[in-house]
Amino acid sequence: MIINSLKRFGITTGAAASAAAKAAVIGLLNKEKRSTVVIPTPIGLRLEIPVEKVEIDSEISCAEVKKFSGDNPDILDGLVIRCCAKLNENNEIVIIGERGVGKVTRSGLKATMGEMAISPTVREMIINAIREVTDKGIQITIEVPNGETIAEKTLNKMVGIVGGISILGTTGIETPVSDDDYLEHIRCELNVIRQSYDYVVIAPGNSAAKYAAELFDSNCIIKVGDRIGDSIKLASNLFKKVILAGLPAKLLKVYAGIFNTHYSQGDARLESLTHASVLAGLPYGTLTKISNALSVEEAFTYMTKEQRRKVMNIVAEKILSRIKSFNDNINFCVIIFDYDGESLSRVGC
């Protein structure tokens, strides 16, 4: 099979908002309309992002950036994110979400209930981008002109975000992770790791990889996106030990036997969590709250730390039994992290 080595990466909504905010601040302070801006990212890379439009008035400046999803099938591709900047009386940077930005209506998400759905990482990205321009106080207003309409086609409402889209992103970069070419890239990366290690750590996403890097050499960690099952099968033929390390939401799908965790392949996260919680003997009142939650993060707010550990141990044991069927001769290990990076369960390690 020929690998398409020119797969296009994209930018997250958070990166688009950061670029729009920086362009707006440059317009406000320098009266300059930039066609591109360069922003810092949490992973140390700098991104040059096109700016679609800049409007400058005496006391306010607005800029628009289009989200670009690369080769990912993404309904948000081409969505305009607009940021307006004006001076703030103090030296703080205040970030406000308005039209088209979703509002958080349930607990358990990264943004606090009642706030707009702008993640803490994105807020930090925006602040860092602006601080490259000025140390003055700035108020940034984020709008997504078509956000409310587009949000109806996403899963936002199911997790308690209403009225618009979420402004998210842990790295600023969107990786093409859902097609067959990507699986071939995984195969190649596994072969490279094999030259130096007899074990590999499989992490579904950026946060899992970050937390795993605190336990293992980062050079033996591979991010596999949704292709968890295929990656484990490939790795089981190459390594003596295969470690699956992830966060609860993704791994609850694997608990249910869903090895391609793309949303189109099924969900069962809360059903799986409820099932494991029953097996763990959690009280009926807690079970009711868990089953009625809109997200795993919300469900976790109803559980004590000890209950989380007990439930995730059951989840990890079941996952271990599932992946052992791929190759009985391999030492498999499952690690489940809490959302703050703490290890909730380690089975087979």
Curated annotation (Swiss-Prot):
GO MF annotation list: cobalt-precorrin-5B C1-methyltransferase activity
Cell membrane listed as a keyword: no
Presence of the UniProt keyword Isomerase in the record: no
Source superkingdom: Archaea
InterPro entries from the UniProt entry: CbiD (IPR002748), CbiD_sf (IPR036074)
EC number in record: 2.1.1.195
SUPFAM superfamilies: CbiD-like
Catalytic activity: Co-precorrin-5B + S-adenosyl-L-methionine = Co-precorrin-6A + S-adenosyl-L-homocysteine
Pathway linked to the protein: Cofactor biosynthesis; adenosylcobalamin biosynthesis; cob(II)yrinate a,c-diamide from sirohydrochlorin (anaerobic route): step 6/10
GO BP annotations, alphabetical order: anaerobic cobalamin biosynthetic process; methylation
Keywords in alphabetical order: Cobalamin biosynthesis, Methyltransferase, S-adenosyl-L-methionine, Transferase
One family name in Pfam for this protein: CbiD
UniProt family annotation: Belongs to the CbiD family.
Stated name of the protein: Cobalt-precorrin-5B C(1)-methyltransferase
